[in-house]
Amino acid sequence: MRYLKTPHFIHTALPLVVTGFLIAGVADARTISYATGYPPQSIGAEAGKAFADAMEDYSDGELMVKVYPQSLLSFSETPSGVRDGMADSGLVLTPYFPSEFPSTNLAAEISMLLELTDAPAETAGLAYAGAMSEYLFNHCPECSGEFEAQNQVFIGGGGTSPYMLLCNTPVRNLEELEGKRVRIGGAQWSRWAEDLGASPVSVPQHETYEALSQGVVDCTIHSAPELTIVKLMEVVSDITTGAPGGVFAGVGNTVNRDTWRNLDEQQRSSVLHASAVLSAELSWGYAEAAVENMKTAERLERIDIHDASDEMKVRTREFIREDLDNMASTYSEKYGVNGADEMIETFKPILEKWVSLVDGVESGEALAELYWKEVFSKVDVSGHGL
């Protein structure tokens, strides 16, 4: 992955019945409830608003969306809540549920593959989100089956900006990483930390601020937007880019399967079109926040920004290659995923393609159009999820 010195871009019991009501000029409009664990005014909540606006637009007012940010369902409640009809639609973080979404999580967990490509850090999450959506829609019937088993239909993904080391002490090379207590947010980063001599520590995201400020951990592996989302900018003294890399892409925008079946084909197409907007706005929001936060950190004298040493980058790439082989057997043995190695090989060229496709994208609107043109518009709404 290339880390550009200059930003690539910068611009300021039964399912809920899809409720009918009248709008001026539009009869029989329907409202879809959408739950997200993101708090109001966050990147995720704003993406939810974009989803609602796009739904009304693309359906010519036939479908409306009521967004419930961090109120109707938490992230931990969303899969069961959408399954049981507490919400018609919601944002599911699949890594939180390893037994329910193993095939999906396999694709999400290999995101450190980005470090073996020429993807700029600024567009890495955009590429991975596109690749995940294409893979789940077109190449992973097992993934679709996992959502359907939860009475849900997958309608899109998303991706964060790259993960890096946010620390309270300089960690620029393997020697400085040795023995450090590192808060991790995913299995792949835990394995990376352990392999490179650090001690992975499991800390809930909302407790990361306190853990860093009190020295419970020396570093956390997070993306740059968390500098403001979790206010880590206040307690971090050193940021190291270039390692470990990878993005969080275990994001599934879903709709209750019974709700989906109650829509006609044109309405399903409108839902997918709006979901392409949500995927783009979520991924773009993280990418843009990462650029802004890194620029802010550069201006603060109390924060030093480092690039990982060449030795650390080389060792990271070695780890990624080794881990890919081990991951296939792990998912097969632990979760019963058949053909895990073939799944990984299928995903690789899709990711490479998307690294190129997002190159030069300069707005969330352009990204949404790209997602729609390349993937979402090609989904067979007469069969998908039914």
Language model segments and positions:
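N-terminal secretory/targeting leader peptides
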Residues: 30-123, 150-386
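Bacterial N-terminal signal peptides that target proteins for export
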Residues: 2-16
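Short, solvent-exposed loop/beta-turn-alpha elements that line the ligand-binding surface or hinge
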Residues: 114-149
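Intrinsic disorder/low-complexity signature
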Residues: 5-8, 25, 93
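Sec/Tat signal peptide C-region and signal peptidase I cleavage site
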Residues: 22-29
